[in-house]
């Protein structure tokens, strides 16, 4: 493949443009640099920036059918061979479990043995690990190593997020054992996060598996083996997601049962109270009619005797309920 002039890929508003130095480090791209398989370039763009969008639309270095994909139209994880290059779309979780489940960030990559062009709109936090390694001189040395390290970082972030969700589910299960019900909508949000993760991580695992089996010229056998390990690790994460989804279904049934039991207990308590006080209510209503005068109204102990009668009546009803094992 022909070498590329640095001036042809030096986009002014790029997030960064680096030359891999083959020793695990990078140096800033200049117009005088020559980009080839021995000195590959990583160009990272925000496709919403004007000059980056203009470069993506006009550069002859990219195939025509790649431009739209790099400009944000491709969202589902996939991998496509495009002549001498490869187009890869990946997803990464960026934040904590408090975010909405659709906060998965897309990153699109077109690469060959000379050039890596990656685009995004929102920042991909997983790339910070790769960038840090390159700045410290312990990063990837070539395009194949770069792709493996990026996929490894994305999988690490996904695994951490899945682990956080798993811990939340364990806490919910422990709380349910103590009859503590989560806030309204909490379990639904947790379940949706799991489902969205499952939706995008399953095809991403397939992307990793295909990259490990494709005979890409810029990947060696060791890098393919590492990519297969990453695919297997993400597959175990997907198994954990499936288990968590099933557990949230069980918890939803358990929450419904706890709420039903609480409602039944309250209804039962109110019914018992009504049964205890029903006779006394009848007597007070009967004596309060006052059509022929209140019985015992002229006797000074009449009210006291009536109160004693009510207490005895309530006690008798309560004793009957207790012996009947209702109370």
Swiss-Prot record:
State the UniProt keywords alphabetically.
Cell inner membrane, Cell membrane, Ion transport, Membrane, Transmembrane, Transmembrane helix, Transport, Zinc
Query: Can you supply one Gene Ontology CC term for this chain's record?
Result: plasma membrane
Q: Where are the transmembrane segments?
A: 274-294, 301-321
Q: Is Cell membrane one of the keywords? A: yes
Cytoplasmic face: residue ranges?
1-273, 322-327
Q: Where is it predominantly found?
A: membrane
Q: Which Pfam families match?
A: CorA
Stretches of the chain found on the membrane's Periplasmic side = 295-300
Q: Which GO terms describe its molecular function?
A: cobalt ion binding; cobalt ion transmembrane transporter activity; magnesium ion binding; magnesium ion transmembrane transporter activity; zinc ion transmembrane transporter activity
Name where it's found. Answer: Cell inner membrane
The keyword Zinc belongs to this UniProt entry's keyword annotation: yes
Catalytic function, reaction form: Zn(2+)(out) + H(+)(out) = Zn(2+)(in) + H(+)(in)
What membrane topology does the UniProt entry give?
Multi-pass membrane protein
Q: Which family does it belong to?
A: Belongs to the CorA metal ion transporter (MIT) (TC 1.A.35) family.
UniProt xrefs under PANTHER family: CORA FAMILY METAL ION TRANSPORTER (EUROFUNG), ZINC TRANSPORT PROTEIN ZNTB
Q: Briefly state the protein's biological role.
A: Zinc transporter. Acts as a Zn(2+):proton symporter, which likely mediates zinc ion uptake.
Protein name in UniProt: Zinc transport protein ZntB
Question: To which species is this protein native?
Answer: Escherichia fergusonii (strain ATCC 35469 / DSM 13698 / CCUG 18766 / IAM 14443 / JCM 21226 / LMG 7866 / NBRC 102419 / NCTC 12128 / CDC 0568-73)
The UniProt gene name for this protein comes to zntB
């Amino acid at each position: 493949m022909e070498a590329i002039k640095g001036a042809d890929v030096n986009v002014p508003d790029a997030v960064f443009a680096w030359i891999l130095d083959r020793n695990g480090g990078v140096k800033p791209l200049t117009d005088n640099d020559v980009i080839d398989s021995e000195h590959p370039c990583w160009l990272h763009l925000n496709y919403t920036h004007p000059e980056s969008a203009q470069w993506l639309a006009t550069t002859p270095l990219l195939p025509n059918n790649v431009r739209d994909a790099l400009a944000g139209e491709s969202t589902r994880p996939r991998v496509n061979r495009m002549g001498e290059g490869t187009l890869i779309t990946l997803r990464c979780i960026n934040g904590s479990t408090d975010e909405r489940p659709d906060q998965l960030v897309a990153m699109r990559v077109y690469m060959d043995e000379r050039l890596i062009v990656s685009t995004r709109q929102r920042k991909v936090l997983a790339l910070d690990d790769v960038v840090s390694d390159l700045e410290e001189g312990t990063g990837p040395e070539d395009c194949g190593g770069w792709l493996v390290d990026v996929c490894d970082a994305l999988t690490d972030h996904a695994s951490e997020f899945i682990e956080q969700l798993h811990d939340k589910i364990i806490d919910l299960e422990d709380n349910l054992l103590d009859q503590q019900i989560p806030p309204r909508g909490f379990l639904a949000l947790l379940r949706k996060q799991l489902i969205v993760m499952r939706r995008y991580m399953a095809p991403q695992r397939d992307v990793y598996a295909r990259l490990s089996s494709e005979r890409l010229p810029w990947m060696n056998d060791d890098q393919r083996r590492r990519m297969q390990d990453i695919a297997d690790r993400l597959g175990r994460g997907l198994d954990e997601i499936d288990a968590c989804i099933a557990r949230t279904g069980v918890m939803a049934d358990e929450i419904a049962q706890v709420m039903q039991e609480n409602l039944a207990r309250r209804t039962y308590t109110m019914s018992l109270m009504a049964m205890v006080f029903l006779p006394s209510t009848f007597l007070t209503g009967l004596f309060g009619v006052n059509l022929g005068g209140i019985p015992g109204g002229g006797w000074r102990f009449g009210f006291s005797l009536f109160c004693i009668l009510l207490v005895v009546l309530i006690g008798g009803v309560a004793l009957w309920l207790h012996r009947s094992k209702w109370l």
